[in-house]
Amino acid sequence: MPKRGNRRTRGSRGGSRGGSRNLLKNRTRGNKRKSPSSNTYNRLSSSQYQELMDLDSIYIPNGEMAEVGRNMGRRRYGKLAEEAAYTESHRYEDFASKTFRNRPIEFIKAKEVYDPNVILHKLTQEKKTQYGDIIDEEFKSISLDDSEADSEADDDDEEEEEEEEEEKDGQEMENENETDDANEEADEQSSELWNDEEEGDSQEDWDEEELRKVLDKKLVQLQKELDLEQDVGIVEKNEKDIIDKEDKESDVDDSILNADKENSEQFVNIGKNQSEIESEDEDGDEEEEQDLDENNDFEDDSDDDLDDASIEDINGEEFAKQNDVSSISYLDENNIYSEKLSRDESLDSIPGSKNVDNSSSLEEITVKSKPKDLVKNATNNFINCNERTGKDKPESEPEYGFLEEDYEFDVSKIEVSNVRFGISNQYYVKCAELTGTTVDEFFWFDEEDVIDYVLANGVKEHRLAKFLSFVTKGMVGGNESESQEDLDAFTIDVNGLDDDDESDDDEDDDEDEDENKFASGQDDYPYDSEDGLEDLIAYTRNSTQGLVPMLDRDFSRNIPAKSRSTFDDLDIDPDLQSSLTRQLKNYNHNKREKRKARKDREVEEAVLRNDMLIKYPEKILIKEIRAEFEALLKDESRHSMSFPTLDSHGHHTIKNMADCYHMTTDKCGKQGVRHYLKVSKTKSTFKYFPNYKRVNAIMRGRPIFHRIDRKPNPKDKKTKTISGRGSDSGGRAKFKEGDIVGAEAPEIDQNNLGRQMLERLGWSKGMGLGLSGRGINEPIVAKVKMSKTGIK
């Protein structure tokens, strides 16, 4: 027999245990078309429940967020029809919901035409030149018409205006007063034309190509005029420089002639020859001045004249080397080498003077002095090279390692620890490729071998000196005295080429004097003095480990500086010991106070910026969690807050608390120790009141939550110590490093039962334990070890 009703309806045919879905269908009479799903809520009007539907009656906090809460959910317009009309008309015009590529683009013609003449006019007024008026007139006369006929007419007008302006410029150069009046009139006319053209051009379009052609034409013509003016100024300047140079050379030549006449009468003929050379130079200079008048060949003539002048200057220097009595200077312009002679020396002391007659010409003097001059020039050039490498090179050339080419060689392959100077310098090198062995040791190598190896493996030849200085760490080329000695060794004494024997004797005498000084200086040190010997003996007597090797010494009693409180273990004066102890206590006290003040300051700053990581460094209470939620709810400037990392139950508690305040939680950070929760406000936060019943239920749960991203404070572990028996303080006994366990324990009394038992068995004081006294007489010593230095 089938059942009357199923499980869902619970007897839909009129059973008393359950109602039917269409219960109202049978009861309704009259209007049967009405939907059976209608309820009492639809029948009743909303006017009966105005208090529930009015959003203004809900409590919302004051401020900006309160205003947002009131307006939330309301329509933009008062009626639905107005809102529908608004959305229908702005369906395709609301660009906020469309992408950029779907938005239409409209091109609107500008009301005013862009005219670049305004900018050009301002620039010409700022940088006014003698051609400024011409530029103004030319740019103002530019037309912006599209038709070709108008552009051609404008070009003709511009050419006529240019001719008129050139005539005006010629008149202005002749008479200044007339130019001023003309400029004023031109300015007035140009301003009128400028205003007229602006009014006409504002209504017309302009052609860029025509404007560009006209501007290029005018700028090229103006550039030609400026170049011509610069060429004229350069020619005048060069003529002035040449005249000044001739005056200086004539003054120098006059001073040289006067010095020769005052020194001796033997150089009269030489002075005449020199005056002839000077006259030739003056003639050559006059010819140069005539050549300079031609503009086309100006550069070539100036180069030839400079070459001739340099050759004549060199000849003059060679002549001065042989015949100047006051001083002999070699290449004095480069400051290379100079040697002074006294005024009273005779002519025979000058090199090359024996072979020269007073009546000889200048050519004979220069020919006979060539060998000596070559030697001098070679010597001076070598010295100049060394001076440049020693002085100028460090300033201009960077150290090794600052250029890209320096990294072609691996510097770690070679290591130099010492250098030996001699006939052939040697380096104490450690290099596997150079030695050919894998042994990590140093070997002596000649400098030539090291240089060959280095150059073959990537070091540039011009960077070799810097490389050696870098590898030897300043052992080579670091002293200026050595470089000066090398320069002195290569210098050649030109005056004493024939006096070799005398120079050798002088050198021997100097060496003997140096040896005597060195020998006498050796005896100054008191070898037999006993200064400090008594202190050394006293130290060896008092020191317990003075003669013990470092590996065998016992450092177990050394107290670290952090844990030191006294200086009793030091053998120092008691007054000094008390002073050090007092200073140490003050230092530790001040350090603790500073640390405490710094932590308090950090906590205050964290409270101001609501940083929970500093406010709650170890744990957070459930009361503090609720206080943070209340502060966030009342603070209108904040919209979110982040809690420290807690365990899973703590995160679940925070999530439940956020639901009570109608807020959301987000998981942030990495999974694990870095995982934390971020609580944020929502729209519902300002619509509804917090569920304080559920909040109170959560408050009755777990009271404390520890942070899992921080280790527990070790001080808390120390406080949880088991109290020792018989100790009033309740703490354990503390031992120091190296203390003997039970060293201060008293001897076992005879009343002890264990001792009485041993005595009855035949044991007496001083005997060993075990069968026939085979055991040890003294107990094994046990030392306390707190450090991690190993077993001693």
UniProtKB/Swiss-Prot annotation:
Residues 36-47, 265-274 have a biased composition (Polar residues). Residues 750-792 form the G-patch domain. It is found in: Cytoplasm; Nucleus. Residues 1-11, 24-35 have a biased composition (Basic residues). Residues 145-209, 277-316, 496-515 have a biased composition (Acidic residues). One of its GO terms (cellular component) is nucleus. Residues 619-683 form the R3H domain. Residues 1-47, 139-209, 225-327, 343-364, 494-530, 709-734 are annotated as: Disordered. It comes from the Eukaryota. Keywords: Cytoplasm, mRNA processing, mRNA splicing, Nucleus. Belongs to the SQS1 family. PANTHER family: G PATCH DOMAIN CONTAINING PROTEIN 2. This is Protein SQS1. It comes from Lodderomyces elongisporus (strain ATCC 11503 / CBS 2605 / JCM 1781 / NBRC 1676 / NRRL YB-4239) (Yeast). The gene is SQS1.
